[in-house]
């Protein structure tokens, strides 16, 4: 990465250097557009699950934007060359955590989520330090199975939102479904029939379209926006923090899985933009930095950060790796996070619009898992690993209380009975270790 400084048009293809202003702004905005929906949506989903007020939901969105910016800057400018990867990546709030966060939040509330995040961040740091030795436990077969399960477990959330949001006066209303389906149609059309910025911003444009329609149908409530401040800094410890061991274990497992996904994203970034694989030091620093920011985020009421695959995709297509481009994107998100009125406006997005926009994201997550699973062909061994892991993971969570009877301590139901991702991850690792290998298998 020791490229010479340059101010030519080729500067955007070098890690260091000063890109021309005419290149810098559009390239930075491209990454903002790709990331912003993914940054704010998890905060909205978790806030709704935990029953937060409009003001607290605004705060969570604000903190999500700020933490995304700081986490990205940490990756671009590592501390002590150990905390952060020093690679061109955009960080954000990951959907991969949502099923487990919703399970914890629904049972224990937001304080327990934040406590589990701190423990999860420590787990990520340990994983990053030991990445060379732990990585072999998570081949594409195992990681793909978990990602596939994550996608499946998010579908009910998307459908509830498309219907108007459980408990909402608009739930099951034909207007909610009309707005959701129009939003989805716009996303699908732009994603498959257009190119360039409109394709990249398909979800954002879909949300804007759905929002306008919902506004004229009387679904949008703007009453809380006027009271929000124009500029404000987030304060530490806005919520209590509690540590529930079972919740910490559940989320810690997801942090491990997400660390493996980070390895994939960093590898795709360096292969696509730098024609090389990442070094062990870069992988370690990237995961450690992710853990550090998750711990910091918990103290400010934020959610876990992770690398953003959609932004990795941009790098592999345009091969722009200049850190000034990514730093500008981070600064734009940071400024947005310092404006509570903007965050408050985002809380007015109707749930049917969010559902219509995100169900395509969740479908993509599911298919990404399938693509990883089928890498190198599909064998009877893979069928057993995936089938049994998903069957137990999804099946157990569909039968309420099946692990809460006599003979089971309460923590068993909390860890294994509420999150399909945790069960699927453990089963996939175990089966991949004990089932006999096949010469043609890639797992």
Which residues does each predicted region cover?
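Short, non-helical or kinked segments that cap or interrupt transmembrane helices
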Residues: 59, 82-95, 136-145, 199-204, ...
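N-terminal signal-anchor module of multipass membrane proteins
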Residues: 1-89, 96-104
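Intrinsically disordered, low-complexity non-transmembrane regions of multi-pass membrane transporters
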Residues: 1-27, 222-235, 271-278, 430-443
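Hydrophobic, membrane-embedded alpha-helices of multi-pass small-molecule transporters
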Residues: 22-35, 172-184, 201-202, 217, ...
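Interfacial segments of multi-pass membrane proteins
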Residues: 102, 191, 311-322, 326, ...
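Membrane-embedded alpha-helical modules
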Residues: 104-223, 330, 335-443
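Hydrophobic, small-residue-rich membrane helices and short re-entrant helix-turn-helix hairpins
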Residues: 193-205, 230-238, 251, 264-288, ...
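Membrane-embedded helical hairpins/re-entrant loop segments and their flanking transmembrane helices
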Residues: 16, 21, 47-84, 252-323
């Amino acid at each position: 990465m020791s490229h010479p400084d340059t101010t030519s048009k080729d500067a955007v293809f070098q890690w260091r250097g000063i890109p021309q202003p005419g290149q810098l702004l559009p390239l930075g905005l491209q990454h903002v557009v790709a990331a912003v929906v993914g940054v704010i949506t998890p905060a909205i989903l978790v806030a709704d699950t935990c029953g937060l007020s409009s003001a607290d939901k605004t705060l969570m969105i604000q903190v999500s934007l700020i933490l995304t910016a700081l986490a990205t800057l940490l990756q671009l400018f590592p501390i002590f060359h150990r905390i952060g990867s020093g690679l061109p990546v955009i960080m954000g709030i990951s959907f991969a955590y949502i099923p487990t966060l919703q399970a914890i939040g629904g049972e224990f509330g937001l304080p327990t989520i934040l406590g589990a995040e701190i423990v999860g961040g420590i787990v990520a740091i340990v994983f990053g330090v030991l990445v060379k030795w732990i990585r072999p436990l998570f081949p594409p077969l195992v990681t793909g199975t978990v990602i596939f399960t994550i996608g499946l477990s998010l579908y009910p959330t998307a459908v509830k939102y498309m219907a108007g949001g459980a408990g909402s006066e608009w739930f099951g209303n034909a207007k909610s479904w009309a707005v959701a389906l129009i939003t989805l149609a716009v996303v699908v059309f732009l994603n498959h029939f257009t190119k360039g910025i409109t394709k990249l911003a398909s979800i954002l444009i879909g949300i804007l379209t759905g929002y306008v329609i919902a506004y004229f149908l009387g679904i949008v409530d703007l009453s809380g926006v006027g009271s929000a401040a124009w500029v404000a800094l987030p304060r530490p410890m806005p919520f209590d923090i509690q540590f529930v061991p079972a919740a910490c274990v559940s989320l810690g497992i997801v942090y491990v899985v997400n660390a493996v996904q980070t390895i994939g994203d960093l590898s795709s970034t360096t292969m696509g933009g730098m024609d090389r694989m990442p070094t062990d030091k870069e992988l370690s620093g990237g995961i450690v930095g992710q853990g550090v920011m998750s711990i910091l985020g918990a103290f400010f009421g934020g959610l876990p950060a992770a690398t953003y695959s959609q932004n990795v995709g941009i790098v592999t297509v345009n091969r722009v790796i200049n850190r000034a481009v990514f730093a500008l994107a981070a600064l734009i998100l940071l400024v947005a996070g310092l404006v509570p009125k903007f965050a408050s406006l985002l809380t007015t997005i109707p749930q049917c619009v969010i559902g219509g926009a995100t169900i395509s994201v969740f479908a993509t997550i599911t298919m990404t898992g399938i693509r990883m699973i089928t890498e190198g062909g599909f064998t009877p061994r893979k069928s057993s690993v995936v089938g049994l892991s998903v069957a137990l993971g999804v099946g157990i969570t569909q039968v309420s209380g099946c692990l809460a009877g006599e003979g089971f301590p309460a923590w068993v139901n909390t860890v294994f009975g509420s999150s399909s991702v945790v069960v699927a991850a453990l089963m996939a690792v175990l089966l991949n270790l004990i089932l006999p290998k096949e010469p043609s298998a890639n797992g």
